[in-house]
């Protein structure tokens, strides 16, 4: 993987990730394909929304279908027939989400398989091996996603262990002869001094890109913005920056303003299945009865298949009848909305008009523009 940085506007960056499997224009949003599928979508449909890279889930694909079945097909690309690049998370966040059924030690994490209850152990070395078999174009180190809230002492211990795991991940990745990209993950909760230590430690080890982890886990938005403003200026200019698990459209805008290049989140797909649809001036909750006889398109400015062909009344009808097509049409639209937003941000950076774009974005949704407060 090669990262090319074209231009900047304030802290925002316009560039691209170049892989053997294709080019990803940045800032980029990655749809989430947890089990080897973006829910309800064929790979061609996902590509048609404008997505150039997707995210796969190491933890879930390891448990089911498992490494051996994956290797029978070749790798994850062959298994799911996605032709573009794939980033896989390391399994750290999923282990964090297991709560009481997992035990974290220096060696790794012991937990119960949520599918059948079997005892399982996952460590940095195993995570690197699974992601190698998946053929991931971007591999994520194995870390502990520090929960929120966490006091300073716990956050420090967690961050320091994640740094040791980062070195172990790097060592196993290299010993496998993996020629793809490996990203480090910055931890430290909401504490700037701990984030500083994490950044320095990861940069000293050396990675192909750097992710900001441990955000979007319940902390106030102001803390997320503050940490991004503090961390991003410290990262190498020639490496991509990835904000994990984020987020709402406003979060993407604010991340880009603060220098983030990559995002992922289940929000557009999960919300689509729940009738929560993103449009140019906010949100349409299609289950609301006021859309029963609304013959207008979901979003007159959107060029997706759904908006070009169907009315709000039809989407309301499909949702009321629990028709699978409703969830699919909603998903096509939400994914296209996210890709249109990213394309708009990229163009605004190219033209040096990002803050004008941001101002218009918030004006249309009726919200105030969050300030950027750091002097970094």
UniProtKB/Swiss-Prot annotation:
Recite the UniProt keywords alphabetically. Answer: Glycosyltransferase, Metal-binding, Queuosine biosynthesis, Transferase, tRNA processing, Zinc
- UniProt binding sites for substrate: 89-93, 143, 187, 214
Summarize where Zn(2+) binds, as residue positions: 302, 304, 307, 333
Report the co-factor binding details. Binds 1 zinc ion per subunit.
Q: Which pathway does UniProt place it in?
A: tRNA modification; tRNA-queuosine biosynthesis
At the top level, the lineage of the source is Bacteria
Q: Which reaction does it catalyse?
A: 7-aminomethyl-7-carbaguanine + guanosine(34) in tRNA = 7-aminomethyl-7-carbaguanosine(34) in tRNA + guanine
Keyword Zinc-finger part of the UniProt annotation: no
What function does the entry list?
A: Catalyzes the base-exchange of a guanine (G) residue with the queuine precursor 7-aminomethyl-7-deazaguanine (PreQ1) at position 34 (anticodon wobble position) in tRNAs with GU(N) anticodons (tRNA-Asp, -Asn, -His and -Tyr). Catalysis occurs through a double-displacement mechanism. The nucleophile active site attacks the C1' of nucleotide 34 to detach the guanine base from the RNA, forming a covalent enzyme-RNA intermediate. The proton acceptor active site deprotonates the incoming PreQ1, allowing a nucleophilic attack on the C1' of the ribose to form the product.
Q: How does it assemble?
A: Homodimer. Within each dimer, one monomer is responsible for RNA recognition and catalysis, while the other monomer binds to the replacement base PreQ1.
Query: Could you tell me what this protein is called?
Result: Queuine tRNA-ribosyltransferase
